[in-house]
């Protein structure tokens, strides 16, 4: 049975009464159709017109519109009037008979119109009562009945189906604007068939649509919590998008158990993207699980923000308004005598809190191993720092290795995931780091790699039409630069240090374009050499081009003078000889302090000799 049949069956009772009323005491059906005036026909609903047309002998009424049915009935009226005119002389024997016939026709017309009005009022009252007492689904069925006055029955039925499908689909908060447009386009467009009826029905529909939009849109009110509700605690990272927000409960990627947060709650409590929030959601009652309108469970209570109270979070400063400075507090990476990687970095490229460093590496030069050594050194020597390792477009086995070898927060999106996941993970991770810096904490972010992040933005972002060499869109270069530019030392307290890897010599013109964009943004650079790595010498550091800007702020005056003499000696050698000499001398000492003392005693000249 189709939906058209259901609509027709739902109105059979009224249509039968109407048909019986119209055809009572009228031997000629066509004459009865003729007695109904044009005004009466325009006030009838579509099923009533079809029933009247069928009684009048009109065929094919199921596919006719309202205007076509009225025209067909008018044609039958004309035929009936013609018959009456032709038969008039034989039956009309006087003025009294004509007057009686006219009065009878007028009385019959008034009776038909009264019956139609009573039937319509009864059905309207039943619809209004059902709309008040029944749920949303009953209200939609009543709306389909009331829409019988629309010009196009097929279009009305399709609109009802679309509205029903939208209701069943639930409040997809990712498409709020589309839902609102669809809801507004499904407004009933009926004729004014009663004084005040259109206004009452319009207000009823507007109120219902307003409730729907309030439930579905991101600007909706907060979910109310009743006393008898059972709540369940939740915690996660807040991800604020355009018109809605979610608490990511399973990490930094979207998951099926994420919690929806209304925009009113976000604005009311001053929430920001990257906040670590705790709260509660309402547990669905028995039998309510299958009838939930919302795809995600909403947050009904907010307990804490970043481990503190909600009121304290409203008073925190904004990251963009904090004053950045050059790094002036050093991060010591030296750990054990046999861990030469961190010892070389301390000598060649000292790192401070708030540093923006790039590890420029060709493939298979050991950049991932260097990142692991740096991460372990930070967690061992700098316990006050919060470590975050962000792996973008990385191999799954390297993610597992990093998670097991690093005592820190590892955030990863493997290469088998879409580019949009890479960009989402990186953006949410850097926003989380900013929120920690706003609290005055020192954060260290290790990114592998900035080149792959640029590729992901190039593939995920819409084309702007300005394509650079290598197929790189010009708009895809700004988001990775914004990520790297977040590193800074804050004057008011706290710092954000970013150490990112950049790939070169990959044979890709696009990778070279991305690297050239970031080349001048960092204030420290560690360059790896593939030829040194092919000789199985690790770390494969090219000493001469590596270094740190303003390194005198990180080193003591005595240490700065000795390091300066060391760099002058190594600059006279090629890259292979320089790293070999440095590694051989480091193996002879247990600490960098001993090595620098030895250099000061054995190296002739000073930084002032020229």
Swiss-Prot record:
<dbReference type="GO" id="GO:0016887">
    <property type="term" value="F:ATP hydrolysis activity"/>
</dbReference>
<dbReference type="InterPro" id="IPR004665">
    <property type="entry name" value="Term_rho"/>
</dbReference>
<keyword id="KW-0805">Transcription regulation</keyword>
<dbReference type="InterPro" id="IPR011112">
    <property type="entry name" value="Rho-like_N"/>
</dbReference>
<keyword id="KW-0806">Transcription termination</keyword>
<feature type="region of interest" description="Disordered">
    <location>
        <begin position="117"/>
        <end position="227"/>
    </location>
</feature>
<dbReference type="GO" id="GO:0003723">
    <property type="term" value="F:RNA binding"/>
</dbReference>
<dbReference type="Pfam" id="PF07498">
    <property type="entry name" value="Rho_N"/>
</dbReference>
<keyword id="KW-0378">Hydrolase</keyword>
<dbReference type="Pfam" id="PF00006">
    <property type="entry name" value="ATP-synt_ab"/>
</dbReference>
<keyword id="KW-0347">Helicase</keyword>
<feature type="domain" description="Rho RNA-BD">
    <location>
        <begin position="231"/>
        <end position="309"/>
    </location>
</feature>
<feature type="binding site">
    <location>
        <position position="395"/>
    </location>
    <ligand>
        <name>ATP</name>
    </ligand>
</feature>
<keyword id="KW-0547">Nucleotide-binding</keyword>
<dbReference type="GO" id="GO:0008186">
    <property type="term" value="F:ATP-dependent activity, acting on RNA"/>
</dbReference>
<comment type="similarity">
    <text>Belongs to the Rho family.</text>
</comment>
<dbReference type="InterPro" id="IPR011113">
    <property type="entry name" value="Rho_RNA-bd"/>
</dbReference>
<protein>
    <recommendedName>
        <fullName>Transcription termination factor Rho</fullName>
        <ecNumber>3.6.4.-</ecNumber>
    </recommendedName>
</protein>
<feature type="compositionally biased region" description="Basic residues">
    <location>
        <begin position="199"/>
        <end position="214"/>
    </location>
</feature>
<dbReference type="InterPro" id="IPR011129">
    <property type="entry name" value="CSD"/>
</dbReference>
<feature type="compositionally biased region" description="Basic and acidic residues">
    <location>
        <begin position="215"/>
        <end position="227"/>
    </location>
</feature>
<dbReference type="InterPro" id="IPR000194">
    <property type="entry name" value="ATPase_F1/V1/A1_a/bsu_nucl-bd"/>
</dbReference>
<dbReference type="GO" id="GO:0005524">
    <property type="term" value="F:ATP binding"/>
</dbReference>
<feature type="compositionally biased region" description="Basic and acidic residues">
    <location>
        <begin position="189"/>
        <end position="198"/>
    </location>
</feature>
<keyword id="KW-0694">RNA-binding</keyword>
<feature type="compositionally biased region" description="Basic and acidic residues">
    <location>
        <begin position="118"/>
        <end position="131"/>
    </location>
</feature>
<dbReference type="Pfam" id="PF07497">
    <property type="entry name" value="Rho_RNA_bind"/>
</dbReference>
<dbReference type="InterPro" id="IPR036269">
    <property type="entry name" value="Rho_N_sf"/>
</dbReference>
<comment type="function">
    <text>Facilitates transcription termination by a mechanism that involves Rho binding to the nascent RNA, activation of Rho's RNA-dependent ATPase activity, and release of the mRNA from the DNA template.</text>
</comment>
<comment type="subunit">
    <text>Homohexamer. The homohexamer assembles into an open ring structure.</text>
</comment>
<dbReference type="InterPro" id="IPR003593">
    <property type="entry name" value="AAA+_ATPase"/>
</dbReference>
<feature type="compositionally biased region" description="Polar residues">
    <location>
        <begin position="178"/>
        <end position="187"/>
    </location>
</feature>
<dbReference type="GO" id="GO:0004386">
    <property type="term" value="F:helicase activity"/>
</dbReference>
<dbReference type="GO" id="GO:0006353">
    <property type="term" value="P:DNA-templated transcription termination"/>
</dbReference>
<dbReference type="InterPro" id="IPR041703">
    <property type="entry name" value="Rho_factor_ATP-bd"/>
</dbReference>
<keyword id="KW-0067">ATP-binding</keyword>
<dbReference type="InterPro" id="IPR012340">
    <property type="entry name" value="NA-bd_OB-fold"/>
</dbReference>
<keyword id="KW-0804">Transcription</keyword>
<feature type="binding site">
    <location>
        <begin position="352"/>
        <end position="357"/>
    </location>
    <ligand>
        <name>ATP</name>
    </ligand>
</feature>
<dbReference type="InterPro" id="IPR027417">
    <property type="entry name" value="P-loop_NTPase"/>
</dbReference>
<feature type="binding site">
    <location>
        <begin position="364"/>
        <end position="369"/>
    </location>
    <ligand>
        <name>ATP</name>
    </ligand>
</feature>
């Amino acid at each position: 049975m189709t939906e058209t049949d259901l609509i027709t069956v739902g109105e059979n009772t009224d249509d039968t009464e109407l048909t019986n009323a119209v055809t009572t005491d009228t031997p000629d059906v066509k004459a009865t159709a003729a007695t109904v005036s044009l005004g009466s026909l325009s006030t009838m609903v579509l099923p009533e017109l079809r029933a009247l047309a069928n009684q009048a002998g009109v065929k094919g009424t199921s596919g006719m519109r309202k205007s076509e049915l009225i025209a067909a009935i008018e044609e039958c009226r004309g035929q009936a009037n013609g018959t009456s005119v032709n038969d008039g002389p034989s039956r009309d024997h006087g003025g009294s008979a004509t007057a009686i016939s006219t009065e009878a026709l007028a009385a019959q017309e008034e009776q038909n119109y009264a019956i139609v009005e009573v039937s319509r009022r009864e059905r309207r009252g039943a619809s209004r009562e059902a709309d008040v007492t029944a749920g949303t689904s009953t209200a939609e069925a009543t709306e389909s009945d009331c829409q019988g006055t629309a010009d196009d029955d097929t279009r009305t039925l399709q609109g009802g189906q679309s509205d029903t499908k939208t209701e069943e689909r639930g409040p997809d908060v990712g498409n709020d604007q589309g839902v609102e447009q669809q809801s507004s386009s499904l407004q009933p467009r009926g004729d004014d068939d009663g004084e005040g009826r259109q206004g009452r029905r319009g207000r009823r529909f507007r109120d219902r649509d307003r409730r729907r939009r309030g439930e579905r849109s991101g600007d909706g009110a907060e979910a109310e919590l009743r006393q008898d509700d059972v709540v369940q605690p939740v915690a996660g990272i807040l991800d604020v998008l355009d018109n809605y927000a979610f608490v990511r409960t399973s990490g930094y990627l979207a998951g099926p158990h994420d919690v929806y947060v209304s925009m009113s709650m976000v604005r009311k409590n001053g929430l920001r993207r990257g906040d670590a929030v705790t709260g509660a959601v309402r547990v669905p009652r028995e039998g309510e699980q299958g009838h939930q309108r919302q795809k995600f469970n909403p947050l009904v209570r907010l307990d804490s923000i970043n481990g503190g109270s909600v009121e304290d979070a409203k008073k925190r400063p904004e990251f963009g308004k904090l004053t950045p400075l050059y790094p002036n507090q050093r991060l010591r990476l030296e750990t054990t005598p046999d861990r030469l990687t961190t010892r070389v970095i301390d000598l060649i490229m000292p790192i401070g809190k708030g540093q923006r460093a790039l590890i420029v590496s060709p493939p298979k030069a050991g950049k991932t191993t260097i990142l692991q050594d740096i991460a372990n050194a930070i967690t061992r020597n700098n316990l006050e720092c919060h470590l975050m390792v962000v792996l973008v477009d990385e191999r799954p086995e390297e993610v597992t290795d990093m998670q097991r070898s690093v005592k820190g927060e590892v955030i990863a999106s493997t290469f088998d995931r879409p580019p949009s996941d890479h960009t989402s993970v990186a953006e949410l991770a850097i926003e989380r780091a900013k929120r920690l810096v706003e609290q005055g904490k020192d954060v260290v972010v290790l990114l592998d790699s900035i080149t792959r992040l640029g590729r992901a933005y190039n593939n995920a972002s819409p084309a702007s039409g300005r394509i650079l060499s290598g197929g790189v869109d010009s708009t895809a270069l700004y988001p990775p630069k914004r990520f790297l530019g977040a590193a800074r030392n804050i004057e008011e307290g706290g710092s954000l240090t970013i150490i990112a890897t950049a790939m070169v010599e990959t044979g890709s013109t696009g990778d070279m374009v991305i690297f050239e964009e970031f080349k001048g943004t960092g204030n420290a650079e560690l360059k790896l050499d593939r030829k040194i790595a092919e000789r199985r010498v690790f770390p494969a550091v090219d000493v001469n081009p590596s270094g740190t800007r303003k390194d005198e702020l990180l080193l003591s005056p005595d240490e700065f003078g000795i390091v300066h003499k060391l760099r002058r000696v190594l600059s006279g050698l090629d890259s292979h000889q320089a790293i070999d000499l440095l590694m051989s001398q480091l193996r002879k000492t247990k600490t960098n302090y001993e090595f620098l003392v030895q250099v000061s005693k054995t190296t002739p000249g000073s930084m002032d000799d020229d």
